[in-house]
Regions:
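Long, low-complexity intrinsically disordered regions
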Residues: 6-252
């Protein structure tokens, strides 16, 4: 069962060939400008692995006229987009970014951690844009254990956490390293159900057509995109199955 697929309503029967044609036509749209492609996709996954190519370059090469590897990062400061976590890490439209914030992280920071964050935030606001080295030099936070069991600069880890919580935004990159600026906050979406439906629609725009199981898993991944609404995911998934078209493909 694919959800959604083609223009058929719920549980229509379609052939595998028809689904393939639809999938190709839907995702490989006519090459356009970089801003329009990002707006259409809503989200572009980022991955630093360069073999065979980085994920963002593989995605955009066939969807942007005259695209060259690295164009996204080079033009990022002027594109009006953000680096952020959606169902995984990547580049998101400003509209999607606003939907996910203000974000309440599941990992609760103690008062001492927040005090450090506010000191760094004041420093960033004073400087405008900062490289992690500048923060480390200013505050000398030392080292911390990273996700892989190794050692990382504690300042870098703090900046990552501040970025995820919406205190900072990525202003640009220098040699692949994120440089940060302060991010101005805004009010939370007044209608949680509508906001969750909009997040689900970004998943559909990016990944459909796809099997119901895969679709359901991606909706559950919204726990990282909007942890403050993690309890609203099941209801959003149920609404999506009611409002989005689906199909049985070759009897499956």
């Amino acid at each position: 069962q694919a959800c959604p697929a083609l223009s058929h309503r719920h549980m229509s029967a379609v052939t595998l060939d028809a689904l393939r044609r639809h999938a190709v036509a839907r995702t490989l749209f006519k090459p356009t400008t970089l801003p329009k492609a990002i707006d259409k996709l809503g989200f572009v996954q980022a991955d630093p692995i360069r073999a065979p190519a980085r994920a963002q370059d593989l995605t955009l090469r066939h969807r942007v006229r005259d695209y060259r590897a690295g164009d996204l990062e080079a033009r990022y400061p002027k594109l009006g987009i953000e680096e952020d976590f959606f169902v995984n890490y990547g580049f998101v439209s400003r509209e999607l970014h606003r939907l996910m914030h203000p974000r309440t992280a599941r990992a609760v920071w103690p008062k001492s951690r927040w005090a450090m964050a506010h000191e760094v935030l004041a420093f960033v606001r004073e400087r405008g844009v900062v490289h992690p080295r500048e923060v480390d030099r200013q505050f000398q936070h030392g080292k911390s254990r990273n996700w892989f069991g190794g050692s990382s600069n504690a300042s870098t880890e703090l900046l990552d956490g501040m970025h995820y919580r919406g205190l900072l935004r990525v202003a640009r990159r220098e040699g692949g390293t994120r440089c940060y600026a302060a991010r101005e906050g805004h009010e939370a979406a007044p209608d949680v159900a509508a906001a969750m439906d909009a997040l689900v629609d970004v998943i559909v725009a990016k990944y459909a057509p796809l099997p119901v199981a895969s679709f359901s898993q991606l909706v559950m991944f919204l726990a990282a995109a909007a942890p403050q609404w993690r309890d609203a995911r099941k209801a959003a998934l149920a609404r999506a199955k009611q409002r989005l078209p689906s199909a049985v493909v070759d009897g499956v």
